[in-house]
Regions:
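Membrane-proximal intracellular helices of multi-pass ion channels
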Residues: 2-406
Length: 406
């Protein structure tokens, strides 16, 4: 059950070694990953396509804003576009990986290429190999293909659509503009990738990357920066990284991918809006200005609320897991940072672990399962809850009161 939930939630955590699974088992996991990766977005598209009597206008607008950055929204067309992009990207990834694995003399290069292509694009982190991708730590070609698949799966279909339309506009008279959403996603994605890669290279040079030649240190620094935010593949064991690096990795996992994507976490755009408001926002208007565009108070409030609630849920998960594994924490089998890392990885549907997943007791496994499920569906559910709460508040007026804060 643990592996099934992990696959559907596109997390990648597993309590069992991957070499115990048969070909049939891997096919089932692969289908669960594909279903889990596209399931929510497909469900949302059908949800919005329902008659207005079954879905309120407010909820319809909310889900549009949350998943699709499109002015003229047509659910069936968007769904068709999502499935088309997914098929094309995964097919190209499959062909490229098949060539790479063939040259690497992998006996099962066809099936492994298909499995890893789907897992990478869906940001699942599952691999048919026992030690994830550690066998390809020095293979620039294979890791580069996987990194591109992870990024494409993590930026969101709205961004891919916007960029494709922009490229098409160069060949037609119709002009297409890059949306503010796309600009924020690209900015945050590049910032997190570059920052993480530079940090890993400098501070893990003589630690996790100590035995690697210089080219592989650069390659694995970049790969670690990309995979740790949501994908969960690893070329090196996570318990080899120094504690300061692990803490930074936890922050990156919590941020995750971008809104409207297959990735987990609170999302890059959410963090960007909250950060912009904290340091450059109009407190009275409760809004922020970016690229000469005003981002509404509703989006600002939603961002802050999602981060706050996610942090509370994650803290509860960490506390419960610590209680469940109190004996192992006391005798030194687990460390506090192991528990925090495991819960954050589950909540952000990353799938990386410091080697404790297989040693968790029954209660701890249930906690991780619930954390994965909440992390996969929770942000969307929280957005709906926030919207409903605001609607109920708008119908009643209460006296205002002042409270000192800070």
């Amino acid at each position: 059950m643990f592996t099934s939930v992990s696959a559907v939630c596109v997390t990648g955590l597993s309590t069992l070694s991957m070499d115990i699974y048969s070909r049939t088992g891997f096919i089932i996991i692969m289908l669960l990953i594909e279903f889990g990766g596209l399931g929510i977005i497909t469900f949302v598209s059908f949800y919005i396509a329902l008659p207005a009597k079954k879905v309120s206008i407010v909820n319809r607008k909310l889900i549009r804003d949350f998943f699709i950055d499109d002015i003229e929204y047509r659910p069936r067309r968007i769904l068709k576009r999502i499935l088309t992009y997914t098929l094309i990207i995964q097919l190209i990834g499959f062909i490229l990986l098949m060539c790479g694995l063939y040259l690497a003399k992998d006996e099962n290069f066809i099936f492994n290429a298909l499995f890893i292509s789907i897992s990478a694009f869906c940001n699942a982190g599952f691999s048919t190999m026992n030690n994830s991708l550690s066998g390809f730590a020095g293979n620039k070609y294979i890791l580069s293909v996987i990194m591109i698949l992870i990024i494409l799966g993590g930026i969101g279909f709205a961004v891919i659509t916007n960029l494709v339309q922009k490229i098409k506009s160069f060949f037609y008279t119709k002009k297409e503009y890059i949306s503010v959403h796309t600009k924020i996603v690209i900015l945050m994605t590049l910032f997190l990738i570059i920052t993480g890669a530079v940090y890993n290279f400098i501070f893990e040079f003589n630690y996790a990357f100590n035995n690697l030649p210089l080219p592989q240190k650069i390659l694995n620094s970049l790969f670690q920066s990309i995979t740790l935010r949501t994908a969960g593949f690893e070329t090196l064991p996570q318990n080899k990284f120094a504690p300061p690096s692990t803490l930074l990795h936890i922050v990156f996992m919590f941020i995750g991918g971008s809104s409207g994507s297959i990735a987990g976490g609170v999302k890059t755009t959410t963090v960007f809006i909250a950060f912009l408001y904290a340091f450059n926002g109009d407190e009275e208007a409760n809004a922020v200005i970016y690229k000469k565009r005003q981002i509404s108070a509703q989006i600002v409030n939603k961002s802050i609320t999602i981060i706050s609630r996610s942090f509370i849920i994650l803290f509860c998960s960490i506390f419960l897991l610590a209680l469940a594994e109190n004996v192992k924490l006391t005798n030194g089998t687990f460390s506090s940072i192991d528990i925090i890392f495991e819960c954050t990885s589950a909540f952000a549907t990353v799938g990386l672990s410091r080697g404790i997943t297989g040693e968790l007791n029954f209660a701890a496994k249930i906690i991780i399962i619930l954390t994965m499920f909440i992390g996969r569906t929770g942000v969307f559910a929280m957005a709906l809850k926030i919207n409903k709460s605001k609607n109920s508040l708008n119908t009643v007026s209460y006296p205002k009161e002042t409270v000192m804060v800070g």
